[in-house]
């Protein structure tokens, strides 16, 4: 019988950053070297930050210039990899995330069957470290009695 994990223990917490702002925010704060910033901008790389074992890590980098399409792609990949409990999904944004991107993200999640889709504004720490235009989401994964994911 599937059981829901606690809302305080999300299976996945992801943040993706629109690197149009990397040079303005992350470089100024010293979090990204000039070489890394230039390489990310040339290759159009956007970092995906995951919360694993209580630490924020750069799990992957996705490539492309259409941030809206990349956000939808990220959602699809993660929901396919981790079967979600379709009750709730929490979405986080920093100022600068365009309204059409927010609407596309919400439409994708509702189409996937999520019942409660809630947006939250990121606090000062996430905004200062990620910069404008950051999108994040968290959901609970459905697990079997012994902790294995459903097929």
Residue spans for each PLM region:
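Mixed-charge interfacial surface used for oligomerization/domain docking
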Residues: 1-151
């Amino acid at each position: 019988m599937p059981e829901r994990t606690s809302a305080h223990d999300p299976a996945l917490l992801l943040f993706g950053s629109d690197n149009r702002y990397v040079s303005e925010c992350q470089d100024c704060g010293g979090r990204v070297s000039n070489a890394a910033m230039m390489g990310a901008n040339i290759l159009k790389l956007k970092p995906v930050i995951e919360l694993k074992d209580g630490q924020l890590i750069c799990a992957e980098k996705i490539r492309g210039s259409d941030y809206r399409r990349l956000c939808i792609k990220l959602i699809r990949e993660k929901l396919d990899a981790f079967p979600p409990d379709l009750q709730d999904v929490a979405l986080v944004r920093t100022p600068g995330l365009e309204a059409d991107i927010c609407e596309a993200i919400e439409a994708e999640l509702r189409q996937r069957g999520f019942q409660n889709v809630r947006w939250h504004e990121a606090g000062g720490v996430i905004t200062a470290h990620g910069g404008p235009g950051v999108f994040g989401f968290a959901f609970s994964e459905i697990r079997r009695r012994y902790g294995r994911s459903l097929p």
